[in-house]
């Protein structure tokens, strides 16, 4: 029986990660960086000490509860290497999840098997920041896994499941509520697009549809058209969006009860409006996504020409670009 090449690559990735994990545990035998806060908390829960809580911890106990579940199911011990292995297992869940998310965004067929993730998804899973925390006991991996599961479920129309996984993601990082909102919007748009496709196929359908032009063809003049199409689809939108009320209401209740977003150590984690963080994200994503952008069929020069045309192709676009640049500079000055 032939083994799919993606399965071989995925197996090699898993074996390599296990080898790295063993090396890390051999060299770093004591809790490292923030692990002195996370590991004792998890070990307390493993002992059934549910009333223990380290006031220095800033995130909810999702990671520690997951460790208790794995301990109960697989009879794991809550030693440092085993707790770190939790994140290694979560890392190995990333390639299948990313493969299915990519297929969803591209409207492609997903891999036939969970052990046949695409090579691209494996490369993304090895992204240095996420990969580094695969060998330590941190909240990053659990947060990413549940966020991806939320986006995938929402995009496929499983909104109740998406709301549940979204709520679970917030128990790892409470700020994941932003990703829950993104997943909800993405899932609703996917539903609207599927309805539009059905209405186009069925000539006698009078079902209202959202005005949703292609991003590359859209302009500022399309915004009023999009907004004017919303009232007609509002009942459908509410019917689709209601499951997400649960995590949003839960988050709002938490903030009210806690007196803020950060759970503990509030003196060192005061919330503030930091607009340039969005610019950092765009620059960071553009830098690491540049190889993909320049490898497109149209080529680098076509990309440069298209960006130039959209920024300065005509008086209105040039004025808009200058105005946005000014607003960006003002936001950097006042909100850094």
Task: Tell what function each PLM region has.
Residues 1-21, 315-322:
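Start-transfer (signal-anchor) and selected internal transmembrane alpha helices
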Residues 20-21, 26-41, 50-67, 81, ...:
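Extracytoplasmic catalytic/substrate-binding loops of multi-pass membrane glycan-assembly enzymes
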Residues 38, 91, 124, 140-148:
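Hydrophobic core segments of transmembrane alpha-helices in multi-pass, intramembrane catalytic enzymes
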Residues 85-109:
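Transmembrane-helix motifs of polytopic, lipid-linked glycan transferases
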Residues 117-128, 152, 166, 170:
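Short helix- or helix-capping micro-motifs
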Residues 129-142:
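Short acidic/glycine- and proline-prone juxtamembrane loop motifs at membrane-interface regions
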Residues 148-153, 160-174, 179-184:
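Membrane-interface alpha helices of multi-pass inner-membrane proteins
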Residues 170, 176-336:
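Membrane-lumen/periplasm interface segments of specific transmembrane helices
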């Amino acid at each position: 029986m032939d083994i799919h090449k993606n399965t071989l690559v995925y197996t090699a990735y898993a074996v390599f990660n296990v080898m790295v994990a063993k090396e890390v545990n051999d060299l770093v035998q004591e809790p490292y960086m923030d692990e002195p806060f996370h590991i004792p908390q998890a070990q307390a829960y493993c002992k059934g000490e549910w009333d223990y809580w380290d006031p220095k911890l800033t995130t909810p106990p999702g990671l520690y509860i997951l460790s208790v579940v794995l301990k109960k199911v697989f009879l794991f011990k809550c030693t440092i290497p085993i707790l770190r292995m939790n994140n290694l297992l979560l890392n190995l869940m990333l390639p299948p999840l990313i493969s299915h998310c990519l297929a969803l965004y591209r409207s492609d067929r997903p891999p036939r098997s969970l052990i046949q993730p695409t090579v691209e998804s494996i490369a993304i899973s090895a992204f240095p920041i996420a990969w580094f925390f695969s060998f330590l006991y941190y909240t990053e991996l659990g947060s990413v896994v549940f966020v991806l599961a939320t986006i995938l479920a929402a995009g496929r129309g499983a909104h109740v499941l998406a709301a549940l996984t979204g709520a679970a993601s917030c128990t790892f990082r409470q700020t994941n509520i932003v990703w829950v909102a993104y997943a909800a919007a993405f899932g609703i748009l996917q539903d609207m697009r599927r309805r539009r496709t059905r209405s186009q196929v069925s000539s006698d359908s009078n079902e209202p549809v959202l005005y949703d032009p292609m991003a590359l063809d859209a302009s500022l003049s399309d915004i009023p058209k999009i907004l004017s199409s919303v009232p007609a689809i509002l009942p459908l939108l509410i019917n689709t969006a209601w499951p997400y009320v649960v995590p949003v209401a839960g988050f709002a209740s938490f903030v009210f009860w806690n007196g803020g977003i950060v759970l503990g150590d509030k003196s060192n984690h005061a919330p503030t409006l930091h607009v340039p963080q969005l610019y950092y994200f765009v620059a960071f994503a553009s830098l690491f996504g540049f190889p993909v952008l320049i490898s497109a069929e149209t080529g680098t020069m076509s990309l440069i020409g298209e960006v130039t045309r959209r920024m300065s192709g005509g008086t209105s676009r040039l004025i808009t670009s200058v105005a946005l640049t000014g607003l960006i500079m003002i936001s950097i000055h006042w909100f850094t």
